[in-house]
């Protein structure tokens, strides 16, 4: 019997009068931040933030191993960083 009495005090569902039913419905359907704040102030246990659908936690994508993804061979030789038409920024001293 004592455990039942304990659950009553711990379970806020037994005291719906602390929460505004209209606000609770809005919180459940639209999850308005203003409504949530009021609910959290009135009874944080009755309408917890968990009512808002949390974004699914996606597992981290495994980085592809270099062996499974070989680099593509260049069809054409890579051009030099500075084409021959471009003079060197600083001529070598003679």
Swiss-Prot record:
Biased composition (Pro residues): 53-94
Region annotation (Disordered) ranges: 1-26, 47-94
InterPro entries cross-referenced by the UniProt entry: Lelp1 (IPR026076)
Family label: Belongs to the cornifin (SPRR) family.
Protein name listed in UniProt: Late cornified envelope-like proline-rich protein 1
Species the sequence originates in: Macaca fascicularis
Taxonomic classification: Eukaryota, Metazoa, Chordata, Craniata, Vertebrata
């Amino acid at each position: 019997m004592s455990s039942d009495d304990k659950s009553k005090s711990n379970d806020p569902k037994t005291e719906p009068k602390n929460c505004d039913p209209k606000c609770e419905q809005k919180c459940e359907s639209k999850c308005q931040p203003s409504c949530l704040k009021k609910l959290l102030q009135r009874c944080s246990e009755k309408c917890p933030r968990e009512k808002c659908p949390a974004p699914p936690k996606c597992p981290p994508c495994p980085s592809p191993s270099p062996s499974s993804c070989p680099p593509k061979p260049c069809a054409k030789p890579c051009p030099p960083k500075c084409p021959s038409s471009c003079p060197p920024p600083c001529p070598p001293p003679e």
